[in-house]
Amino acid sequence: MKRLLLPLLAAITLPTFEPAFSSLPIVFIKDCYDGDTCTTINGEKIRLACIDAPELKGRKADPILAKEARNFVNKLVANQEVSIKRITNDRYGRTIGELFKNELNIQEIIVEKGYGKVYKKYANQCEWSKQ
């Protein structure tokens, strides 16, 4: 009985890590337009899920902060392979997804470092932003 109970107890109490990084696809990020939009070498445009960063253009633009955010994100992921968790596509045809590098959530890092904020309207799409 103990032989059956111990593995079951371990399975129930061990934390589950979402996502399973080894099963996520890998993409090569060419560059990032701003703090929440990147492009792969294949031309896929990725809108980083669950965050909002300052805009370069438009009514609510803050070009100085937007360039700082863009530079930070480019240092993190440009010209590098990252894992991607694709969630959906937006009305502009961009992939909405989470990026991971060395099993670290890029969006979470952007928010922690102050280059973006949790996009409350879509925060339910990402486990880390629900907390």
Feature roles, as predicted:
Residues 2-131:
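Small beta-barrel nucleic-acid-binding modules, primarily SNase/OB-fold domains
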